[in-house]
């Protein structure tokens, strides 16, 4: 049984989260807190497996409460955030301070019963993932923080006009907003490849995600926009709610195209992005699949490898959730399997082959 403590100042939200969580017979809500002070006291008393944490609460906000729970190593914390730009900035601050991951608040933008079921499934799945990691999250976080390199200022902006000869197509999901910092900040600014990243997240969260990632990286990080000409030494991040596609124009330039066809469970989809990159770059594609639930991108890793490209999958040793990389490995789509703290090294080696 997974024991969960809910923290939210809204009685309606506490009730809604309780109903969602207890629809799973293996989850038990052991208590609820209405402010930051209350959740810290109850977390110490109940010793739950997971805490769901609202950000904006009276007396003591969720960010402050989070730091107490993380520093005392009580349990993983799942942030429950409003789907706004302001909510996104605070949520990414929480992830940097040690939160496990985040989910959008149920209600609000949910417009149908099918949407509600999708939101409920995401919350339950992330609670399950957090609970599985209760005893090893702290160890991994200590290791990750210890190995994280100092932020290096960008040495030089990308030089427009350079030909793009190789591409790195990266996919990540659950745990990704935090763990991606073990990879992309280590990529040098002179890397001779364009980089693409799909991270499953709500539309309003992408600008804040890109802003914080860009501040931590040596390479330029920008949100993928329709019509942008692709340059080497730049990381293009797929927008929430839009698929990231590539096309070649008549001049031979690689251009970004966006679409929002509801033909995949996730939008943006790792598979859509990887297949599009493969179509343009063929055997000069490097596929990278990291932590995440499900199998988005697994078949595309197989296709990249069969086309002569290089594929890198995160190992079970470091994966928050081994679903996506594990599926790629099972299908024979991973040439290289390493923990996340070695992925940047393997990307650089692959580009330089």
UniProtKB/Swiss-Prot annotation:
Any one cellular-component term (Gene Ontology): cytoplasm
Keywords of the record: Chemotaxis, Cytoplasm, Hydrolase, Phosphoprotein
EC number(s) on file: 3.1.1.61, 3.5.1.44
Response regulatory domain span: 3-120
UniProt xrefs under SMART domains: REC (SM00448)
Chief location: cytoplasm
PROSITE patterns xref list: CHEB, RESPONSE_REGULATORY
4-aspartylphosphate found at: 54
One biological process term in Gene Ontology: chemotaxis
Locations listed in the record: Cytoplasm
Active site: residue positions: 173, 200, 296
UniProt domain CheB-type methylesterase: residue ranges: 158-353
PTM remark: Phosphorylated by CheA. Phosphorylation of the N-terminal regulatory domain activates the methylesterase activity.
Entry keyword Phosphoprotein: yes
InterPro entries in the record: CheB-like, CheB_C, CheY-like_superfamily, Sig_transdc_resp-reg_Me-estase, Sig_transdc_resp-reg_receiver
Top-level class of the enzyme under EC nomenclature: hydrolase
GO MF entry, a single one: protein-glutamine glutaminase activity
Record's catalysed reaction(s): [protein]-L-glutamate 5-O-methyl ester + H2O = L-glutamyl-[protein] + methanol + H(+); L-glutaminyl-[protein] + H2O = L-glutamyl-[protein] + NH4(+)
HAMAP family assigned: CheB_chemtxs
Family per similarity comment: Belongs to the CheB family.
Entry comment, domain topic: Contains a C-terminal catalytic domain, and an N-terminal region which modulates catalytic activity.
Function field: Involved in chemotaxis. Part of a chemotaxis signal transduction system that modulates chemotaxis in response to various stimuli. Catalyzes the demethylation of specific methylglutamate residues introduced into the chemoreceptors (methyl-accepting chemotaxis proteins or MCP) by CheR. Also mediates the irreversible deamidation of specific glutamine residues to glutamic acid.
Name this protein carries in UniProt: Protein-glutamate methylesterase/protein-glutamine glutaminase 3
Highest classification ranks of the organism: Bacteria, Bacillati, Bacillota, Clostridia, Eubacteriales
UniProt gene name: cheB3
């Amino acid at each position: 049984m997974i024991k969960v403590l809910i923290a939210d100042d809204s009685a309606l939200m506490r009730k809604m989260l309780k109903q969602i969580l207890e629809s799973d017979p293996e989850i038990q809500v052991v208590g609820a807190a209405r402010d930051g002070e209350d959740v810290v006291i109850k977390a110490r008393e109940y010793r739950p497996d997971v805490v769901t944490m609202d950000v904006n609460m009276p007396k003591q906000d969720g960010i402050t409460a989070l730091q107490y729970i993380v520093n005392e190593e009580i349990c993983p914390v799942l942030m429950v955030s409003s789907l706004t730009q302001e909510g996104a900035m605070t949520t990414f601050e929480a992830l940097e301070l040690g939160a496990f991951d985040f989910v959008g608040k149920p209600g609000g933008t949910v417009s149908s019963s099918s949407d509600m079921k999708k939101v409920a499934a995401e919350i339950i799945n992330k609670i399950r993932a957090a609970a599985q990691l209760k005893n090893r999250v702290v160890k991994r976080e200590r290791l990750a923080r210890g190995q994280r390199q100092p932020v290096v200022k960008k040495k030089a902006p990308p030089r427009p006009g350079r030909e793009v000869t190789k591409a790195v197509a990266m996919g990540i999901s659950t745990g990704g907003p935090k763990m991606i910092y073990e990879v992309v900040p280590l990529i040098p600014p002179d890397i001779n490849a364009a980089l693409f990243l799909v991270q499953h997240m709500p539309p309003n969260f992408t600008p804040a995600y890109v802003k914080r990632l860009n501040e931590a990286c040596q390479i330029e990080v920008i949100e993928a926009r329709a019509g942008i000409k692709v340059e080497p030494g730049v990381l293009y991040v797929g927008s929430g709610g839009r698929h990231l596609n590539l096309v070649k124009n008549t001049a031979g330039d690689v251009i970004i195209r966006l679409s929002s066809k509801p033909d995949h469970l996730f939008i943006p989809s790792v598979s859509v992005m990887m297949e599009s990159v493969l179509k343009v770059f063929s055997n000069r594609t490097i596929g990278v699949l990291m932590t995440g639930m499900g199998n988005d991108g697994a078949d595309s890793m197989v296709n990249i490898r069969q086309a002569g490209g290089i594929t890198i999958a995160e190992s079970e040793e470091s994966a928050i959730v081994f679903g996506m990389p594990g599926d790629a490995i099972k299908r024979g789509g991973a040439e290289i399997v390493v923990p996340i703290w070695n992925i940047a090294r393997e990307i650089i080696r692959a580009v330089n082959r």
